[in-house]
């Protein structure tokens, strides 16, 4: 068993049936095995190999030596000088101190396990784990190819892997105290890496797709690497030197690792994900991609945070996060949000959402420059967030949005608190967070400045709640440094009517809703003469008085009025077309007459309300239709004298629109009944003859009318949350008046059925209710219309035996600047 081989001996044949060989020679004196031209058993050494000597394998290229000894325990080197080596059992290389592989050599582990000391493989060699398990206990250098599946265990020492091993799918385990260095991102192939020791990637570039686990360290030097594997099981440390860029695009890429960053850590993702890792060092974090990354751990890194695209969120209201970054830059496509603290300064050119709960706080330890948009909390969801700037605030034409429960001085609100100075220009908008509007005294403080308050904060857009408009103003006296929201009228803007400076600013929409509601209740109202002109006509061929016919009238009007505060002036223009037809007529005694008819109508009303307090305007419109019945009775159907009664009832339906300046458009519907009863008495007061044979008869007709208006508008909630309730329907309007008209007939028209009736009419109208709108708890009403005086001038004429025309103009005057001018043109065709 003590056979040896050396330079002066012929050697041992591999196929000798020896049971044990003790290796004593080393280097050039090592036992050398070759299997040139041999296969099967002839190329297999099954003897036990023991001793401290080396084992050399020297077959020609492509020829294979197989080792199958079960109890090999030699401790020398294994030198694969040429050819191939095939393992047929576990640990056939004994306790070899090292495995050396020359160029073009191949080791096939063939599914078996082997522990070696050091591995040294030359470029061009191939170590195929092939489902086996290779343990390296003393590091080494692998310049050849590592291929196959199985396990590669680095127990100790420094193991340097050169180049790419894309065909290696084995799991690599780096034990605590061991180190593996790579110069290619695929140095350990595609298999899992259990890094309880140190994995060092030096000057590598590309995607690291291996799944990492363990508690050790993975370091990157002079590298540009994108993590692509599932590293959820890695809880060690990722280290970046100052010349390294490391990209992560999902939470599993970083696992539970702490990150020591001296370079650039790039968070790039199209999706949202949460980063629980702590980051230290003096390197930078760069956010790219449209997704949002939420940081849930405090980080002590002091480098720059550059949000180039997408969002970076710091914690939540109940779990704020501190970021020690000395400079945070938010680009135009970037967003910073959350609750917590940035110890450094922030330059915002994108979107900065400070606070994300009911009362979140965000603190900026340095200065804040706002060139983009800042939102305190999520817009419209809650009020009570605070943005605290320990340094100075500079507005570079940026914008801030506050959520405020718009009410009185005690209202909950978001707030900007600046411990230093303010400079520059900033636009401010406010979103109502459920407030119903109220009267303020000093106002609701939005911006508090401890230092010099040289910055200008200008209101952007309207701020409305309930019936009130709010304005952003600088405080007075000792509060001059701060900025407030107030519903109080500070300075009227050239008011058309004097307004008390202690009043509060009403929204013009209140006037518009009221104008719409008044329009739907009055649009189709009429009196007898509006509908039918001359009450009856004479058939010249028979001399009979007749009243059956089809009629149409068109009316237009312009109305102007103020609300009770005199801040709101409303003007409206209306067009109405109605048509109808008598469908039946008769007489009860041969002297009187009655008729029954149907009618329908279309109307349109446009109105505008302007606030003299704020200059804001609101526009409204109504489109509606009606259908109804009418009935008329005349006591005397022959000589135009005596008593008459007239009544009508209509059902109307309407589409309403309101558009406030800078506010969302609002739409709602109205529908309901209107009805009227009218009576009058016509008597002749005189007669005189004019020149050229004209006969003139003078008549007076006292009139009384009661009109009931019950068109209801739907209760409505505006987009800003204001509840709208319109009142005044149920109004009963009474009209008392008299018409004086002249019936003229010229002998030239005898036999032509032509006559004219110029008239003048005066009325007093009384309304039991005023039309108004309740906006949350504040009412805006139409003033001046409770008692109205009316004058009408017009003419009614029978043009031909079959055609009547009439027209008139009139004006109604009331208190508080109320006026309504109207014109009517009608025709009736008899058949």
Ranges and model annotations:
Residues 20, 24-27, 42-52, 63-124, ...:
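Surface-exposed loop/turn positions within long extracellular repeat scaffolds
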Residues 349, 401, 549-553, 595-599, ...:
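Residue-level detector of the transmembrane beta-barrel scaffold of outer-membrane proteins
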Residues 46, 56-58, 64, 228, ...:
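Transmembrane beta-barrel domains of outer membrane proteins
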Residues 370-372, 376-410, 416:
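Long, polar low-complexity repeats
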């Amino acid at each position: 068993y003590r056979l040896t081989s050396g330079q002066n001996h012929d050697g041992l044949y591999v196929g000798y049936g020896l049971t044990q060989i003790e290796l004593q020679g080393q280097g050039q004196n090592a036992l050398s095995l070759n299997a040139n031209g041999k296969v099967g058993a002839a190329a297999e050494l099954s003897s036990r190999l023991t001793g401290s000597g080396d084992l050399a394998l020297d077959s020609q290229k492509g020829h294979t030596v197989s080792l199958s000894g079960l109890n090999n325990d030699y401790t020398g080197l294994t030198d694969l000088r040429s050819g191939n080596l095939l393992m047929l059992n576990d640990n056939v290389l004994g306790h070899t101190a090292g495995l050396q592989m020359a160029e073009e050599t191949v080791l096939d582990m063939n599914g078996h396990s082997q522990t070696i000391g050091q591995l040294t493989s030359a470029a061009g060699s191939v170590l195929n784990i092939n489902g086996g398990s290779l343990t390296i206990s003393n590091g080494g250098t692998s310049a050849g190819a590592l291929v196959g599946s199985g396990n590669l265990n680095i127990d100790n020492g420094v193991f340097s892997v050169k180049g790419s091993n894309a065909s290696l799918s084995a799991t690599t385990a780096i034990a605590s105290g061991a180190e593996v260095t790579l110069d290619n991102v695929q140095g350990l192939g595609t298999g899992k890496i259990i890094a309880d020791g140190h994995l060092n990637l030096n000057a590598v570039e590309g995607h690291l797709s291996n799944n990492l686990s363990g508690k050790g360290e993975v370091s990157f030097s002079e590298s540009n690497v994108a993590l692509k594997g599932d590293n959820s099981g890695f809880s060690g440390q990722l280290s970046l030197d100052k010349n390294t860029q490391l990209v992560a695009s999902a939470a599993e890429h970083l696992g539970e690792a702490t990150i020591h960053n001296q370079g650039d850590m790039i968070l790039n993702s199209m999706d949202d994900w949460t980063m629980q890792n702590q980051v230290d060092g003096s390197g930078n974090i760069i956010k790219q991609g449209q997704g949002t990354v939420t940081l849930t751990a405090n980080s002590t890194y002091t480098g720059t945070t550059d949000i180039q695209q997408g969002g970076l969120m710091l914690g939540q209201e109940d779990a704020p996060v501190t970021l020690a970054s000395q400079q945070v830059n938010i680009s135009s496509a970037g967003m910073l949000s959350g609750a917590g603290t940035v110890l450094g300064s922030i330059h915002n050119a994108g979107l900065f959402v400070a606070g994300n709960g009911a009362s979140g706080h965000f603190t900026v330890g340095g200065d804040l420059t706002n060139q983009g948009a800042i939102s305190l909390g999520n817009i419209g969801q809650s009020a009570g967030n605070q943005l605290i700037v320990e340094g100075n605030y500079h507005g570079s034409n940026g914008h801030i949005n506050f959520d405020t429960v718009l009410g009185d001085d005690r209202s909950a609100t978001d707030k900007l608190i600046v411990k230093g100075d303010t400079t520059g220009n900033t636009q401010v908008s406010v979103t109502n967070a459920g407030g119903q509007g109220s009267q303020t005294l000093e106002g609701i403080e939005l911006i508090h400045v401890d230092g010099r308050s040289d910055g200008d904060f200008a209101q952007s857009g309207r701020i409305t709640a309930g019936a009130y408009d709010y304005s952003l103003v600088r405080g007075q006296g000792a509060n001059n440094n701060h900025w407030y929201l107030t519903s109080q009228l500070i300075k009227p803007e050239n008011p058309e009517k004097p307004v008390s400076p202690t009043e509060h600013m009403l929204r013009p929409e209140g006037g518009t809703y009221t104008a719409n509601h008044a329009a739907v209740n009055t649009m189709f109202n009429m009196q007898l003469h509006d509908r039918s002109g001359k009450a009856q006509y004479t058939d010249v061929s028979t001399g009979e008085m007749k009243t059956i016919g089809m009629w149409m009238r068109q009316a237009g009007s312009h109305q102007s009025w103020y609300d009770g505060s005199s801040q709101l002036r409303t003007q409206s223009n209306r067009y109405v077309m109605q048509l109808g037809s008598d469908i039946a007529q008769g007489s009860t005694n041969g002297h009187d007459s009655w008729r029954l008819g149907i009618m329908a109508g279309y109307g349109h009303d446009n109105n505008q309300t302007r606030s003299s307090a704020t200059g804001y305007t609101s526009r409204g419109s109504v489109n509606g239709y009606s259908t109804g019945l009418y009935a008329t009775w005349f006591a005397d159907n022959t000589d135009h004298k005596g008593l008459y009664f007239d009544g009508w009832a209509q059902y109307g339906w309407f589409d309403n629109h309101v558009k406030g300046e800078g506010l969302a458009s609002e739409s709602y519907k109205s529908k309901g009944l209107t009805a009227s009863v009218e009576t009058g008495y016509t008597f002749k007061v005189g007669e005189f003859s004019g020149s050229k044979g004209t006969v003139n008869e003078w008549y007076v007709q006292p009139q009384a009318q009661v009109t009931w208006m019950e068109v209801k508008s739907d209760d409505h909630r505006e987009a800003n949350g204001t509840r709208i309730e319109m009142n005044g329907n149920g109004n009963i309007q009474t009209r008392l008046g008299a018409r004086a008209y002249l019936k003229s007939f010229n002998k030239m028209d005898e036999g032509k059925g032509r006559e004219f009736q110029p008239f003048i009419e005066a009325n007093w109208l009384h309304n039991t209710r005023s039309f108004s709108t309740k906006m949350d708890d504040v009412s805006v009403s139409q003033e001046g219309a409770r008692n109205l005086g009316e004058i009408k001038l017009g003419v009614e004429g029978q043009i031909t035996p079959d055609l009547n025309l009439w027209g008139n103009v009139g004006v109604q005057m009331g208190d508080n600047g109320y006026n309504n001018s109207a014109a009517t043109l009608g025709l009736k065709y008899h058949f």
